Swiss-Prot record:
Binds 2 Mg(2+) ion per subunit. It comes from Azoarcus sp. (strain BH72). The keyword S-adenosyl-L-methionine does not apply. It is found in: Cytoplasm. Mg(2+) 1 binds at D16, D147. Keywords: Cytoplasm, DNA damage, DNA recombination, DNA repair, DNA-binding, Endonuclease, Hydrolase, Magnesium, Metal-binding, Nuclease. GO terms for cellular component: cytoplasm; Holliday junction resolvase complex. Its main location: cytoplasm. PANTHER family: CROSSOVER JUNCTION ENDODEOXYRIBONUCLEASE RUVC. This is Crossover junction endodeoxyribonuclease RuvC. One of its GO terms (molecular function) is DNA binding. GO terms for biological process: DNA recombination; DNA repair.
Amino acid sequence: MSSAGRIVATRILGLDPGLRITGFGVIDTLGSQLRYVASGCIKTRDGELPGRLKTLLDGVREVIATYQPDAVAVEKVFVNVNPQSTLLLGQARGAVICGAVSCDLPVAEYTALQVKQSVVGYGKAAKEQVQHMVQRLLALDASPGPDAADALACAICHAHGGQGLGGQAGIGGRRRAGRILSL
């Protein structure tokens, strides 16, 4: 809120990192209202890893220059069955985070469980459920693609303060498995 008592809009860039495709989604928040700005994908070509990471870094910087976000929300890495895939995903995350940090933007990180809980209300929701809820929450005419939807969901999670659709647990309580427990 500004000093004049007005609510100030905040622009959030959500990123869903991947070495082949990194989804991005930009939303504006004004109080509890969410407004879609843009979404898309940064794609890398097959080739040497350093070149692909540079493509991601440059792509994130270009998105930031175009849409001028105030904050960035990035999905955290999950541990895959294949350790090599996990390492590559971690490097892609590093490139997109460096892109944001090099533009002097604050970066928040959320697990997939937190993002799904925030957007769908269920931490183990299917990708299609996330796409559907992103479409509804942002009043989109069509469902965004899976990578863009995940990025928009990450931005929505950040707009919700990392909390689920039900909001934060009250003072003196904590949220666990969808319910508030007394301390």
